[in-house]
Amino acid sequence: MQNDAGQTVELYVPRKCSSSNRIIGPKDHASVQIDFVDVDPETGRMIPGKSTRYAICGAIRRMGESDDAILRLAQKDGLVPRDDVKSN
């Protein structure tokens, strides 16, 4: 949509679920978006530009798989160490 000056305003940008690649619709009120940021150990403040964002759709949350999906994505991105324990 454009205003009288010709500037684009109120443009809806759809998101995709980070886990399932489904498009998160505008009426999916169960979806969440989580940002993980790097923090400076001396000041305790966020380091600008050092963040990882995950969007989880409502369908994944309804199935109870959101915690597993976030853990899998964080392990893939190196935020959480992998648990490579070999069983005997």
Swiss-Prot record:
It comes from the Eukaryota. Keywords: Cytoplasm, Endoplasmic reticulum, Ribonucleoprotein, Ribosomal protein. Gene3D superfamilies: 3.30.1230.20. Its main location: cytoplasm. It is found in: Cytoplasm, Cytosol; Cytoplasm; Rough endoplasmic reticulum. GO terms for biological process: endonucleolytic cleavage in ITS1 to separate SSU-rRNA from 5.8S rRNA and LSU-rRNA from tricistronic rRNA transcript (SSU-rRNA, 5.8S rRNA, LSU-rRNA); endonucleolytic cleavage to generate mature 3'-end of SSU-rRNA from (SSU-rRNA, 5.8S rRNA, LSU-rRNA); translation. InterPro entries: Ribosomal_eS21, Ribosomal_eS21_CS, Ribosomal_eS21_sf. PROSITE patterns: RIBOSOMAL_S21E. GO terms for molecular function: structural constituent of ribosome. It holds the Pfam family Ribosomal_S21e. GO terms for cellular component: cytosolic small ribosomal subunit; rough endoplasmic reticulum. Belongs to the eukaryotic ribosomal protein eS21 family. Component of the 40S small ribosomal subunit. This is Small ribosomal subunit protein eS21. The gene is rps-21.
